[in-house]
């Protein structure tokens, strides 16, 4: 939830960066690159499908790997002819056009062999026999070295696809290697294709990681050097800075198709080209054959990737990036530079990053930055191999094994960083790692060992281009293994705020560790419990029509047919509206229903269901099929709190409910009619606390006992308490003005009635007064400041309890 940005004019020169959210970072060039890259991926997909049909055994491992390598080679050739790497434009196209469909396969095999052969090692008579083939340069780099690749026979369709759609009608030199690498890998990865299409990390999201990690600082340093008015000093510093860029080493331990590495390489080369502009002054600059004006190299980039094909794509994407930036350098220096044969190579290793010793990939003495977007998989969705990975990293029985898979990369990174504390790391991760149980379980441990968050992006939506994938909500966390004195950068909704500390909840607040099993609530507070759990397969539930029918047919059952509510009902039902009923036989007389065939049929189905359950606690309840599996129904009227609620609402909808209405386990119950309790729970203070520490389902709030039991309650005067009771009642009165509206209607930020909004605002002020958040204090106007004060109160309460 965004807060107002206040920038004093006197500080504008230093704090202008905080206005960055006003600027549209996108531009037509980036948009064009993205469109071209996605179109390129679609062309590759067509080629892939056409070739796939031609293999004798397309599902064999050898055929699939051959098909992937074939597509990578073709893409490199298509790019090389459009970028002028091979020589004249259209060279690859013209060579292929000289073959009919039957001869095209052999022509391609011959070309691949020539591209992998040094000029001095080629047949000396090749120029006479086949001058078109002999004109192709030596590529190097290992891209064409595997002669065991299986190339199937061509068809007219493939020939036309390759010559017309892929070559004549498309310009491959315009692709973005950052985007295309990921799109390409997604297009050709069978698992990804089956899951619904293309996936890639946008350039914008990559920069959310690399800009605060290192790029912003490098840009600022270069700008400062360029502003030096003394040419001799400026030139010397530019050369030192260029050597600095060439000395930096990067590791992406889950590099996929290399998009983080590729975009980082492009960013460093753009800085280097800016240096060359300053040094050359627009004049032709001569270099000897043994030296190059370019010092930044793809050999500074290291990656680990479990998928063999993605490794090949990553290397190819970096070569394409190298070629594109070399063209830019040529324009600056006004001299031609030789791209082929490939002289450098990125160090992308195929392997499981959680079982590979990272120092065997890159010596820690060389390493400066670790970054990437490791896979995030919840405990319930892990494969057996992934579960084994987690145990290998954290140890058997460790509480961290129940957390998200992505935290394994944090642990491996920190283990390396402890030996080289100057290394900085930043990962994209699921937002769950900074919520709920992850904070006291993982962050408490690593922070106690010296780790510190240097910058973070709070939760934001991360969508792929897949047609079927659900929206994912992510955070970005940049951290070190040791404390640094510098201010931290906290990004929320695209706005950056400089703060002194960022805690595990990604708040500008002190470190607090709120575990779900702790209970720090005052004695006067009612216990919070989940509603009753049916575990009945739906057989104890009735629609309104079924309830009416049973009541008329069997009057003795009327007292057992009860209204039912839960999280969905309390939010979406209108007052008095009942969408579900349930059979509630607690303390019932078996004579009323034991011989009822309709009831017995339902109970037998429940018994069978429970007997077959994998959960021991459910199997034990098979003999009590007439009862809910877990009964936690209050004996008095109660407050109902839905377990899940959308984050688009400022207040979590809560309501009073009659003890005669059965509450299910999709909501929590508080056996209380206290207006004071209701007022506090419905305040902006309690909702801010919930937003800060609760778990999430996507971005939806996941209320829990940990939120309630650890909430720091105020110590109000009798007058303040009475005021809160009045404002709480005013909320209920305002709701009652709209009997045809559900809480979902009333609490929609766009349609909230003015009477209800005013009642909540009055209640908010009354509660803040009880906390001492008086007018003019930061906690009164800023949610983050309010949460910071609540965390201080929580820490004081815990410390006081521990000292007793």
Regions found by a protein language model. Give the residues of each.
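Segments forming glycine/polar-rich beta-alpha architectures that bind adenosine-containing cofactors
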Residues: 178, 185, 512, 516-665, ...
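Basic, amphipathic alpha-helical recognition segments used for DNA target recognition
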Residues: 668-710, 717-722, 726, 730-734
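Signature of N6-adenine DNA methyltransferases within the class I
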Residues: 1-39, 52, 61, 84-93, ...
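Flexible phosphate/Mg2+-sensing switch loops adjacent to catalytic phosphate-binding sites
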Residues: 90-94, 221-246, 268-299, 322-342
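Glycine- and acidic
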Residues: 28-33, 51-61, 163-171, 186-204, ...
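Non-catalytic DNA-recognition/assembly elements of restriction-modification systems
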Residues: 255, 598-606, 621, 713-804
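Preference for the N-terminal adenyl/adenosyl cofactor-binding alpha/beta module
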Residues: 9, 13-267, 300, 304-313, ...
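Flexible, glycine/threonine-enriched loop-and-boundary segments that flank and lead into catalytic domains
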Residues: 166, 230-249, 294, 341-369, ...
